[in-house]
């Protein structure tokens, strides 16, 4: 199938570039404003980290959203101070009240970031290094952390989290 526009995540952009599935963005917008110049240089640098085979990612993809992995919480049930750390997800007082993203990278990253929080704070490791660590040790850590998290999980979701939270079935997402 041919598509004019797709909305893949950054790691899928990398795969699509590698498999030659993307065309360069046609910047001849005519009278339509060119918003590409308004993208933060920092974000362009981050998307360009996925460049490969001589293709610069920002010539093929426009970052339209940034920082989608965070903690959504119901302030009636979760104090703001609790929601400031990934550790809240493992807190037993939220047993059965957590919705986890049905996203491999979000779950994997959350588990590794929590496990390595002290090393991250000390500058011994970076988030990109953790996110790209698929060693047996990293996988074992993620498995252990997700198993520890299991009692708190109400369900796994991709799109219905806000609705479930407004019904009071979950307090964290």
For each of these PLM feature ranges, what is it?
Residues 8, 57, 66-68, 95:
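Extracytoplasmic
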Residues 10-12, 21, 30, 75-77, ...:
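Solvent-exposed coil/turn segments that connect beta secondary-structure elements
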Residues 77-84, 116-122:
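Short helix-loop capping/hinge motifs at secondary-structure junctions, enriched
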Residues 14-66, 80-87:
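Hinge/lid segment of periplasmic solute-binding proteins
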Residues 97-100, 107, 111-173:
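Ligand-binding pocket segment of bilobal, Venus flytrap-like solute-binding proteins
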Residues 1, 13, 86, 161-164:
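Short, hydrophobic alpha-helical packing/hinge segments within bilobed ligand-binding/sensory domains
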Residues 1-19:
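Early extracytoplasmic/lumenal segment of secretory-pathway proteins
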Residues 68-80:
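Hydrophobic/proline-rich hinge and linker segments of small-molecule sensing/allosteric domains
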């Amino acid at each position: 199938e041919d598509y004019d526009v797709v909305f893949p995540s950054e790691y899928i952009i990398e795969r699509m570039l590698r498999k030659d599935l993307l065309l360069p963005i046609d910047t001849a917008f005519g009278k339509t404003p060119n918003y590409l110049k308004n993208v933060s240089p920092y974000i362009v640098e981050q998307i360009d980290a996925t460049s490969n085979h001589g293709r610069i990612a920002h010539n093929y993809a426009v970052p339209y959203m940034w920082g989608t992995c965070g903690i959504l919480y119901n302030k009636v049930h979760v104090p703001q101070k609790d929601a400031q750390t990934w550790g809240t997800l493992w807190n037993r007082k939220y047993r059965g009240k957590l919705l986890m993203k049905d996203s491999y990278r979000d779950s994997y990253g959350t588990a590794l970031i929590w496990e390595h929080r002290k090393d991250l704070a000390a500058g011994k490791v970076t988030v990109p290094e953790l996110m790209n660590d698929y060693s047996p040790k990293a996988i074992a850590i993620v498995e252990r952390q997700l198993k520890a998290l299991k009692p708190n999980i109400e369900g796994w979701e991709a799109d219905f989290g806000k609705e479930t939270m407004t019904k009071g079935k979950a307090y964290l997402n």
